A protein has these predicted regions:
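Conserved acidic/glycine
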Residues: 1-67, 72-73, 271-419, 429, ...
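Cofactor-binding active-site loop characterized by glycine-rich and histidine/acidic residues
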Residues: 41-199, 217-235, 498-500
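Glycine/charged-rich beta-loop-alpha catalytic/anionic-binding loops adjacent to active sites
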Residues: 47-53, 117-136, 170-176, 211, ...
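Thiamine diphosphate
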Residues: 64-65, 130-340, 402-482, ...
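Short beta-strand segments
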Residues: 82-84, 140, 146, 178-179, ...
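Internal gly/pro-rich beta-alpha loop/helix module
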Residues: 490, 494-539
C-alpha cells in the first residue's frame, strides 16, 4: 500500500488483526522460530568457545527477526549482498550452520572463501540459493556492487532476456542489499541510491538500525536516521518496520520485495533492531555500553516476542522447548564437525589471485597490407566499437562518454549513436560508482567498460577498487573474478595543469589483484584493449593523453597502421622498440632503456645520438610484468636505464630497479639508473615549468652518456 513516497506493509492474507491466525502463518512462524533458535544457539556456542572461535566475528543477536524475514523472501534467481552481521539471513536463504561455521573457523571446506575471509562474508554461486558476490568488511561499500547487480539485471532484462535467470513462472530477479545504520553516512551509499533511482533499478536497501556504530551512538554520529535521510532522495520508496517483531518484519519485507519484483524500482526498508551481542568478538559490549542501554535493548529481544506469538497461536510450551533442544543438539553437532575439519593447505595461499587469462598469445594481423594509419585515440575508439558489435553483453559508461560529446577526448565519439543510450551512456560525477558497480555487473554476466575522465580523479574510486574489485577473485576462492575494463586517460600533454596531468601508475600497482596496461602506440592500444576486455579479471588501461593525437612533438610514430579487428596483444608481454647492434653489445658498448608510455618517445629521440648502442623495451603491461624480457635484456647489455614520467621517488621505476639488481646482479656493469619527473606535488600549468619538471630527450641523452661511460 503506497501513500506518497512511503509503503505501508500488508500481508498476502489481507489486513488481519494479530489475533486472527491464517493456517499458513503458524507454519511460517514455526520455521522462523527454528531458524531463530539456531542463530541464537550459534552465537552462544561461539561465545562459549572463544578460544576456538579465535577469528574476529559478529553475530545477528537482536537482528534475527528482520534478517530471517528478509532471507525468506529471496529465491534462487535473486541476488543478495549481506553484511557481516547477517548470519540469520544466511540461514533463512538456505545456507547451513555448518557452512557458516566452516568460514568462522577458517577451514579449507569453507564454501565461501576457502578459509580466507571472515565469518559471514559469503560469496556463493549455489544454484539453489540467491547469488551472493564476494562481500567485504568495509562498511557500506557493498551498496555500490549491489546496485551494479541491479543495473546488470535491468540491462539483461530489457535487452538480453535469454541471459537472465528468472523464476519458473517468469518471476524477475531482485537484489537485496543489507547494511547497518552506521554505514549510511558513507558517501558511496548516496552514489548508489542516486543511480538506483535514476535508472529505476530493482534493488531493496535494507538498513538494520541498532543505533550503534561500534562504540559511537546514533546521537553522536547522525542528525537523522536512514528513513528520514531517504526522504531527500526523490523517487525512493521507503518504509519503517519493527525489526525485532517477526510479523511486522515479514509483512514489510514481503511488501518491499513484491513491489520491486513487479515495479522494477528501488525501495528502502528501515528496520529498528536491538543490539544484543557484541559489535564483534574483539570489541565487546561491556566495554562501552551502560547497563541501562543494554537492558533497554534486551526488552526488544525478538526471540521472546516470537515465542509469545507462537504460544498465543496454540503452540505448546513443550513444543517450543523441543525445538530449542533440537536446535541446541544440532548446532553442537555441527560445531564439532566444523572444529575437526581440515585447515587450508598453506601451499594453496597463492591460488585464485586471478582467473586464467583468455588471451595468452598475440593473435591477428598487426599491420594488414594496404591498411590505413590511425591515431591512438581512434584505435581505442575502433576497438571499443568492435567489442560492442561482437559482444552484446558489453556496455560502456562514464562521465561524458555518452551522446552529444562522446568523451572529452572524443575517445567515445558516435558510439552512443551507433549502439544506443542503453549501452553507451553518461554517468554522474561519481568515480566510486563507476568503478564499484562493475563488480556487480560482472557478477550477473554483463561485461562493463568504464572510464574515469582523468587519472587525477580516480582516487574517490579507490575504496571500491581495493575493497571490492581487487580482492573479489581471491577471497571468493575464484568464484567471482571481476571482469571489467577501466579506461583512464593519463599523463601530461602540455599545459594541462596540476589536476589534469598526473601519473598514477605507482599508486595503482600497490593494489594486488588488478592488472595495469599502458600502450604507447595505436596498434598496441587496439590489441591490448581487446585482450583487456576479454580478460576475466579487472584491467586498468592507462591511455596517455599526449599520445592520443600525436600532437606532442616527437610522437608521430604513435600513429600506426590499424590492426585487423581480431588483433590481440596478450597482457604481460613487452616489445622491443629499438635493438642495439649485436657487435656493439658483444663489445660491452651498449645499454638498454626500460620504459613505457611517453617514455618510449623520449628514449627513441635520445637514442638517435648513440646509433646501435641503445636497446629500448616498451613494457606495454606494467602488471603482470614481462620479467623474462626485462631480465634477459638487462643481462645481455649489463647497463640499464629505467625511464618513467612519474615523480621518481618511491615509484614503480625505482621498485623495478631494485628487482632488476636482485635478479641480474652478476651481469651488471653499472648500477641501474632511473629517470623520472622531479619530486613535486603536482605538474604546474605553466608549460615552461612543466617542461622543467618532466623528463625529455635531452635529459635522457645525458643519462645515456653517463651510463655508457660508467
Amino acid at each position: 500500500v503506497f501513500k506518497d513516497n512511503t509503503i505501508t506493509p500488508t500481508f498476502k492474507a489481507g489486513n488481519v488483526s494479530p489475533n486472527e491466525q491464517p493456517a499458513d502463518r503458524k507454519g511460517l512462524w514455526l520455521h522462523a522460530f527454528r531458524l531463530m533458535c539456531q542463530a541464537s544457539r550459534m552465537a552462544a556456542t561461539y561465545e562459549a568457545n572463544r578460544s576456538i572461535c579465535k577469528y574476529v566475528h559478529s553475530t545477528s543477536r537482536g537482528h534475527e527477526a528482520i534478517q530471517i524475514a528478509a532471507g525468506m523472501q529471496l529465491q534462487p534467481w535473486d541476488c543478495a549482498t549481506p553484511y557481516y552481521r547477517d548470519d540469520s539471513m544466511m540461514l533463512a536463504m538456505g545456507f547451513t550452520p555448518l557452512e557458516l561455521m566452516l568460514q568462522l573457523l577458517a577451514k579449507t571446506d569453507d564454501p565461501f572463501s576457502g578459509g580466507r575471509s571472515y565469518y559471514c562474508h559469503p560469496g556463493s554461486r549455489a544454484l539453489d540459493r540467491p547469488l551472493i558476490p564476494h562481500q567485504s568488511s568495509a562498511t557500506g561499500m557493498q551498496v555500490i556492487p549491489a546496485t551494479g547487480m541491479a543495473q546488470g539485471i535491468r540491462y539483461l532484462e530489457k535487452h538480453l532476456s535469454d541471459s537472465l535467470a528468472i523464476g519458473p513462472e517468469g518471476e524477475l530477479p531482485v537484489v537485496l542489499c543489507s547494511l547497518g545504520d552506521g554505514s549510511v553516512t558513507e558517501g558511496e551509499v548516496s552514489e548508489a541510491w542516486q543511480s538506483a533511482i535514476l535508472w529505476e533499478l530493482p534493488v531493496i536497501f535494507l538498513v538494520q538500525d541498532n543505533e550503534w556504530g561500534i562504540s559511537a551512538s546514533s546521537d553522536e554520529t547522525r542528525v537523522m536516521d536512514a528513513y528520514e535521510y531517504a526522504a531527500g532522495f526523490k523517487g525512493l520508496k521507503r518504509m519503517r518496520v519493527d525489526g525485532s517483531d517477526f510479523e511486522d518484519s515479514y509483512a514489510g519485507m514481503e511488501a518491499a520485495v513484491s513491489y520491486v519484483r513487479k515495479e522494477r524500482k528501488p525501495v528502502l526498508v528501515h528496520a529498528t533492531v536491538p543490539l544484543l551481542g557484541h559489535h564483534t568478538s574483539g570489541v565487546r559490549k561491556e566495554w562501552y555500553r551502560s547497563e541501562e542501554d543494554l537492558s533497554i535493548h534486551l526488552e526488544k529481544d525478538p526471540f521472546p516476542k516470537l515465542k509469545a506469538r507462537l504460544l498465543k497461536s496454540g503452540v505448546t510450551e513443550k513444543e517450543l522447548l523441543d525445538i530449542e533442544k533440537e536446535a541446541q543438539d544440532y548446532i553442537e553437532a555441527e560445531f564439532d564437525k566444523a572444529r575437526i575439519s581440515q585447515d587450508p593447505d598453506p601451499r594453496t595461499v597463492k591460488d585464485h589471485v586471478f582467473a586464467p587469462a583468455a588471451v595468452t598469445t598475440e593473435k591477428g594481423n598487426r599491420s594488414p597490407e594496404n591498411g590505413a594509419k590511425v591515431m591512438m585515440v581512434d584505435a581505442a575508439l575502433h576497438a571499443v566499437e568492435e567489442i560492442l558489435q561482437q559482444y552484446p553483453e558489453a556496455i560502456f559508461f562514464g562521465q561524458d562518454v555518452g551522446r552529444r560529446l562522446g568523451g572529452v577526448f572524443r575517445e567515445a565519439a558516435t558510439l552512443a549513436e551507433k549502439f544506443g543510450d542503453h549501452r553507451v551512456y553518461n554517468t554522474a560525477i561519481q568515480e566510486a560508482y563507476i568503478i564499484g558497480s562493475t563488480a556487480g555487473l560482472s557478477a550477473v554476466g554483463v561485461k562493463p567498460i568504464v572510464e574515469i575522465q582523468f587519472a587525477d580523479y580516480i582516487y574517490p574510486g579507490f575504496n571500491q577498487l581495493v575493497t571490492e574489485i581487487s580482492k573479489s577473485c581471491y577471497l571468493s576462492y575464484g568464484k567471482f573474478p571481476v571482469q571489467t575494463l577501466i579506461r583512464v586517460p593519463i599523463g601530461a600533454y602540455g599545459g594541462g595543469g596540476p589536476y589534469h596531468s598526473g601519473s598514477i601508475e605507482s599508486t595503482l600497482l600497490t593494489i594486488k589483484g588488478i592488472k595495469v596496461v599502458y600502450p604507447s602506440n595505436a596498434a598496441d592500444m587496439k590489441g591490448l584493449m581487446k585482450a583487456a576486455f576479454l580478460d576475466p579479471n579487472p584491467v586498468i588501461m592507462l591511455e596517455h593523453k599526449g599520445l592520443y593525437w600525436s600532437k606532442v612533438p616527437g610522437t608521430q610514430s604513435a600513429i600506426t597502421i590499424e590492426p585487423d579487428a581480431d588483433y590481440q596483444v596478450p597482457l604481460g608481454k613487452g616489445r622491443v622498440v629499438l635493438q642495439a647492434h649485436p657487435k656493439d653489445t658483444q663489445k660491452g658498448k651498449t645499454c638498454c632503456i626500460i620504459t613505457y608510455g611517453m617514455g618510449v618517445y623520449w628514449a627513441t629521440a635520445a637514442a638517435a645520438a648513440y646509433p646501435g648502442q641503445v636497446e629500448i623495451i616498451d613494457l606495454r603491461t606494467l602488471f603482470p610484468l614481462d620479467e623474462e624480457l626485462v631480465y634477459q635484456t638487462v643481462s645481455r647489455h649489463g647497463k640499464c636505464l629505467i625511464l618513467t614520467e612519474e615523480q621518481l621517488n618511491n615509484s614503480f621505476a625505482q621498485a623495478l630497479a631494485g628487482r632488476i639488481q636482485l635478479h641480474c646482479f652478476r651481469s651488471l656493469d653499472a648500477p641501474i639508473f632511473t629517470l623520472g619527473a622531479l619530486d613535486l606535488p603536482a605538474v604546474p600549468i605553466n608549460m615552461a615549468l612543466e617542461n622543467e619538471m618532466l623528463p625529455n630527450p635531452q635529459k635522457v641523452k645525458a643519462m645515456i652518456k653517463d651510463l655508457l661511460a660508467y
